[in-house]
Amino acid sequence: MPGDLNLKKSWHPGLHKNQAVVHAKEQEALEERRRIQERQKEIKQQRERDELQKLQEMATGKKRVQKVEWMYQDPTAVGSQQAFNEKKVDANSTDDYLLGKRRIDSIVKQKGDLEAFDDSLDRFQPKTDKSESAGIVHKVKDDPMVAVRQKGRELGYTDEANESERRSRRERSRSRERERRRPRRKREDSRDRRNRRDMEREGERRRRRRDGERTRRRERNRDPSPSVSDDDRGYRQSSREERDRKSSREEGGRSRSRDRYRNRSRERYRDRSREERSRDRSRERLRSRRDRDRDRDRDRDRDRDRDNVQSSGRSSGRSSVRSSARSERSLRDRSRSRDPDRDRDYRSRSRERDSGGGQGSDLSDEVGNGRSVLDERSTDMNASDGNSSHGYRADNEFSPSRSPVTRSHRDKRNSYRPEYKDEDDKRFAQRKDKEKEMNALPKGLQQMRAKLLASKKTTTVSGTSQTPTSAPSGSQRTPSAASGSSPTGKAATDAKLSDRLARLKAMQEDAKALEEERDERLASKTKHEEAERLRDALLRQKSAHLGRSEFAREEERKDLK
């Protein structure tokens, strides 16, 4: 049968390693217990001594002052009554011995050699109890700093030696650093000087070469002398060129290393200057962009302020007519861009108007009546629904606000009756508040409201468009009948709209109730989970405290109950 595989495990108690660890722990525990017993024994002895001293004080009636009496436990101390009573020692004798006024030779001559010397030694040594000395020894042994110093002494280290070694190491590193810095500066200075010298020499050489070439060219351009032949001139020129080539080759071989270093330094300078230039360029670009944006914002604010001042300063005339026409046109374009269904309705109405153009003056009367009705209805709709000022009334083709005469009349009215303008501002503020309330609704409710408003506008527009085409002859329908039919349609649309808004509010309340119910369910669920968690923790704690068998028995008893 194979051996026990558990012996392969590091935690197995049969291993010698684990047994040695257990033995060491047991020995430590025994040593600690022995120390505790010794300390308890010392405390007991001290208590007995204190009790005896208390009994002595009670018998004699003299109380012992326990402040600094440990300093006077030596019988040879100055003023010690025990010394005077037992050994009859002079009070100043110990001080004289310590100060060198008296000598020990007389004591040695009077008594025996060893006995007298031992007696003198006993005088100067403080007498302490064995228990106190043992406690001090134990404290010294347990002190970790004493152990560290002892170890250092054994190894031959001392604090002073370590400090001196550290200081010398620091000095060496500083001197090394100084030595490293000095020659580098010298080398750099000498290298710069050498480079400057080489550059000056090179420039001088080039200048000389240029001057020589110029003089040679001048001599060549002059008339050749009859005594000098072409061959001699060519030989001289070729030998001169060879000499120049040789000298340039030698100089190039000598200065190649210098040129290499010079090129490197120039490239480094070029790279650095290129980086600085690019950095400056980017800074300038950012600064110019910031200035441009600031100027643009300033101009825009100035133009806006000027427009506001001009629009508020205009009270009448062509300027007011033009500004109102421009604002109406912009509002109309904005509203058309917002709602494409209105453009469709406008096209259908224009087609119907073109098709019924042959009916004459009767049709124009009907159109006038419809114009007044639609103007009233559009104003009521804008006031009740909370639409913006550039809403249905601005898009209505029958609205009188599109005529310049009406606009100028309104501007004049606002100029000499400012309360009308205040009322318009109040109405506009109310509309804005309603728009904010509607925007605060959820997205689904906003979409449903937009659909309802669109359906309402289509119904009103279709009702107005049927008025001119339904009458075959304009003489049969009267303006009173047309004006009488409009309030009923308005009331019906208002009732529908209020009904749908009530439905929307009910849906919103239902959604809020559902959200609250969901939050309550989540809170109750978290509470139940927390209670279950606490119960499990308590059961686990109880089972660990009682033991598995007793806990199971208690659970069975609960189940039986």
Swiss-Prot record:
Chief location: nucleus
Keyword field contains Coiled coil: yes
Coiled coil segments of this chain: 19-65, 326-389
Signal peptide annotation: none
Keyword set, alphabetical order: Coiled coil, mRNA processing, mRNA splicing, Nucleus, Spliceosome
Residue spans of biased composition, Low complexity class: 311-324, 455-470
Keyword Chloroplast applies: no
InterPro entries: CIR_N_dom, CWC25, CWC25_splicing_factor
GO BP term, pick one: mRNA splicing, via spliceosome
Basic and acidic residues composition bias: residue spans: 122-132, 163-223, 230-308, 325-355, 413-438, 496-539, 547-561
SMART domains to which the protein is assigned, alphabetical: Cir_N (SM01083)
Residue ranges with Polar residues bias: 380-390, 471-488
Subcellular location: Nucleus
Region feature (Disordered): 1-21, 122-561
Quaternary assembly: Associated with the spliceosome.
Function: Involved in pre-mRNA splicing.
Similarity comment: family membership: Belongs to the CWC25 family.
Name of the protein in its database record: Pre-mRNA-splicing factor CWC25
Name of the gene: CWC25
